[in-house]
Amino acid sequence: MKKVKVCSPGTSANLGPGYDIFGLALSNPYDIVEVEKTENGITISVEGEKAEEIPTNVDENTAGVVAKKMIEDFKIESGIHIHIIKGIKPGSGLGSSSASCAGIAFALNELFELKLSKLELVKYSSLGEAVAAGAPHADNVAPAIFGGFTLTTSYEPLEVLHIPVDLEVLVALPNIQVSTKTAREILPKEIPIKDMVNNVGKAAGMVYALYNNDLDLFGRYMSKDCVVEPCRANLIDGYTEVKEKVKDMVYGITISGSGPAIITIPKKEHVIDIENIFKEVWNCPVYYTKVGPGCYVEEIE
């Protein structure tokens, strides 16, 4: 095996009250990560969405950081060339950096037959997130590896729970810049007990709803975060207006990750109406897609 081509999905983290815990894999958008054996060293090339803004230096690129660590840990003597085709816009709130991290970990596992578990792949993938977010995070890389719906419940040790789900989602991607750093800095350092109770209760209810295939309950609770979303809503011009306009057309709506992407669980009969509202307010790309699988191999040479 000389080359492997992997599809790595976009993801939506938080989903309302599940801040830094919940994650969802999306069938669209996605990145393609190609890894080819070379004589020595690690080289990186990028094309696609905002490719010119993505560093190709190994120590500054999220995929490069993951690759370097895995090559060191497993004493891989071969060099590699990483080619990333970005289908997920960086800074979108749809796990762009996570797709690169998960895609390279998955690809190296296949190319060099490392036989790592999905949990081990999440652990390596999360190291690359430190480049983008300042610290390792798994709420996006976990669904990118596992697919479906994931809960990252612990980091020491790393624990990820996985629930296969069948959901359709409608995602808007406003052309608004939201810095992940700013979106984290504006969050409160402490919260009242009543807010903690609200979010824990709603998050638990969402898991219950998934097991009972209750879209109404899942979406209603997804929309009821009282800690993070109120702080971030003002970073996305028009969000409060849109949330009010579509409230009867969706089961649930919230900010995807740190934004600016907005994720909804739409009522099928209103999909076109919601799309029109998104385009009227933001004139932006819209994805009508399903919850999808984690990384998978597209091609091997």
From Swiss-Prot:
EC main group: transferase
Compartmental location: Cytoplasm
GO molecular-function term, one example from the UniProt record: homoserine kinase activity
Binding positions (ATP): K89, P90, G91, S92, G93, L94, G95, S96, S97, S98, A99
Species in which this protein is naturally found: Methanococcus maripaludis (strain DSM 14266 / JCM 13030 / NBRC 101832 / S2 / LL)
Entry keyword Kinase: yes
Entry keyword set: Amino-acid biosynthesis, ATP-binding, Cytoplasm, Kinase, Nucleotide-binding, Threonine biosynthesis, Transferase
Sequence similarity: Belongs to the GHMP kinase family. Homoserine kinase subfamily.
Record's protein name: Homoserine kinase
Catalytic activity line of the entry: L-homoserine + ATP = O-phospho-L-homoserine + ADP + H(+)
Role: Catalyzes the ATP-dependent phosphorylation of L-homoserine to L-homoserine phosphate.
PANTHER family (UniProt xref): HOMOSERINE KINASE, HOMOSERINE/4-DIPHOSPHOCYTIDYL-2-C-METHYL-D-ERYTHRITOL KINASE
